[in-house]
Amino acid sequence: MITKQEKLIPKKEFTNITKRIQRFISQSKVKKGICLIYTKHTTACIRLLEPEKLLKQDMHDFLERLAPSSCKYRHDDLEHRTVPPEERRNGYSHLRAMLLNHQETIPIINGKLDLGKWQRIFYIECDLGKEDRTFNILILEGIK
């Protein structure tokens, strides 16, 4: 098992991390196995998407309809929650992340991610404004 934690400061909602992951796989010299990419943040996700600008806008709009940022959420009632005073009002972000997924598992074949023609790995930040985010890469090497 080979692991690495990557740092990220998301400047946008969708960040393509495919090249970073493939670079790590190439450096590991693993030819056959499984790559697990995950985040430990409750308002961030890892998903396979087509890297098309309008599709990403459609996804943003879809998530906004399901969990509007303008709605009132109990999570945001800081008077009734026991949280630090600097806690963010981000109930919508948690709900959006819950609808997505915090990890993806992709086969490694001949030292490369076995992705479909249009598939790319995206880090999705549901709570923009956060800094120093991370995602983890775990490689399980197959039988040689």
Predicted regions and their residues:
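Active-site histidine-anchored catalytic micro-motif
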Residues: 1-144
